[in-house]
Design a protein with these regions (language model features):
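Amphipathic, charged-and-aliphatic alpha-helical interface segments
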Residues: 70-88, 176
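Short alpha-helix boundary/capping elements
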Residues: 45, 88-89
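Acidic, glycine-rich two-metal-ion catalytic cores of nucleic acid-processing enzymes
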Residues: 1-70, 127-203
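Short alpha-helical scaffolding segments that buttress acidic/His motifs in well-ordered protein cores
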Residues: 77-85, 107-111, 158
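Short, basic interhelical loop/turn and adjoining N-cap
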Residues: 97-107
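Short coil/loop linkers at secondary-structure junctions
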Residues: 72-73, 99-100, 183
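Short, basic alpha-helical nucleic acid-contact segments in DNA-binding proteins
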Residues: 112-122
Length: 204
């Protein structure tokens, strides 16, 4: 990953990448990639409404709606959502928000009740992982995603889904360019018209 331009040394890091004279540098990123991956997985668990909320704009987005349900500010609801979705226990909420044990436990339970399709997905993925010897989950394209522990299953599923989609997109772009007559493969051509420079997070 590369720091955003506004982060410390972010601009300097990004300035390391560029193209030669007479060439043009192009870039793209994916729109709400992680939310779309989540939506894909929760749909079979009666997740139609939740999937729409994942892609909605304020004030109808998932974090705004969760904030109302949980009775906390939107920025806290967003932090809670990502923390719990990626395996945090209630003690993490206690530390993050400065809550007492009982408050943190209540918020933990309230969050999962508010996102029932995601909760059902979490449980189903956990059962699948256990049935496979606690070693892997099945990725969006059928590959094995080796996991560290049960609490990281959703993280592994969603993050791998985004990476897989980005890799497929890159392959498709190369295929389309070659169909248009561009030379892209240095192992087939003496000179090439374009090449990949870098992929990071959900940007190329």
């Amino acid at each position: 990953n590369i720091a955003r331009a506004s982060s410390i040394y972010g601009k300097e890091m990004r300035s390391l990448f560029g193209c030669g004279e007479g060439m043009v540098q192009l870039g793209f990123d994916f729109s709400s990639l992680e939310a779309r991956i989540q939506g894909h997985y929760i749909l079979p668990f009666n997740g139609d409404d939740l999937a729409e909320q994942l892609l909605a704009s304020k004030p109808n987005d998932i974090h705004s709606l969760n904030a109302k349900k949980l009775g906390i500010p939107r920025d806290q609801a967003k932090s809670v959502s990502y923390a719990l979705m990626y395996g945090a226990a209630y003690k993490k909420l206690k530390k993050m928000l400065g809550l007492a044990d009982e408050q943190a436990k209540a918020l933990f339970d309230a969050y999962w009740d508010a996102v029932e399709p995601l909760k059902n997905l979490r449980d189903a993925v956990g059962s699948s992982w256990e049935a496979r010897g606690k070693s892997f989950v099945v990725g969006v394209d059928g590959r094995k995603i080796v996991t560290r522990s049960k609490h990281s299953l959703l993280n592994a599923l969603f993050q791998s889904g985004g990476v897989i989609c980005a890799k497929y997109a890159t392959v498709f772009i190369y295929q389309l360019l070659e169909e248009q007559g561009y030379k892209c493969n240095p192992f087939k051509e003496k000179t090439i018209d374009m090449c990949g420079m870098i992929e990071y997070h959900d940007e190329c």
